Amino acid sequence: SACNTIEYIGIETYNPAEITFPKNVDKVLIVNNAVPQPDDVGYTYNLYGTVQDTARAHADSALYDACHSLGKSIVDVSFFNDVLLYHDGTRQDTKYLVDEKLTPETVKELCRETGTDAVISLDRLLFRMEKDVVAFAEGFVVGGVDIEITGVVRGYLPGRDNPLATVYVQDSVFWSESADNMELLKLYLPSPDEALRAAGQYIGRKVTPNFVP
């Protein structure tokens, strides 16, 4: 059998960012202003044709991962002098479907507290995950995980009544594996929590070009 090796050659190209921050913005703060969806919302697990009513997936870590991934991707571009990740979520309510903007007072206080010039905030992030496992007569099983991601990310400047810009995000990620039995399939496919975290990391990277060239 023949083996082909694919070589990737890195070429640095810079396109204009979708959102232009003022030249005096030197340090930015990444903030999680989204509320995680409940564990029993947005996840459907279909096992051998039967929907499992005990399916649960935790989205709180995925929100953190999205912010962390966004911050790291911005750092890698070396556009701003410094990028900070705020240690706490900013919302205390449970209204996960509500897209709630940061208030001008909150933006001003966050920048004052952290010594930053602007805020990039994840204001909403929702996941819809479907997992399907099918058994074949030949004795093997096939499983797939499909996640649809929707979100809202905004740029804020202290002293402004309205956000600098709003980015609406919609994307998806997918895994598909086959195995001789169910136990092996579990090793190949990510767990529900792992899949959501991977989706969060992915969407954080995907949003980055909106804010940096």
Tell where the protein language model's regions lie, with residue ranges.
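N-terminal post-signal-peptidase region of extra-cytosolic proteins
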Residues: 13-14, 100-107, 133-140
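Envelope-exposed proteins and targeting segments
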Residues: 24-27, 39, 115-118, 145-151
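Glycine- and small hydrophobic-rich membrane-insertion segments that are intrinsically disordered
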Residues: 41-57, 135-144, 179-186
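C-terminal/domain-edge helix-coil "capping" segments
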Residues: 4-25, 154-213
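N-terminal segment of the mature soluble domain
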Residues: 34-121, 125, 160-165
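Amphipathic beta-strand/beta-sheet edge segments enriched in Tyr/Trp
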Residues: 123-179
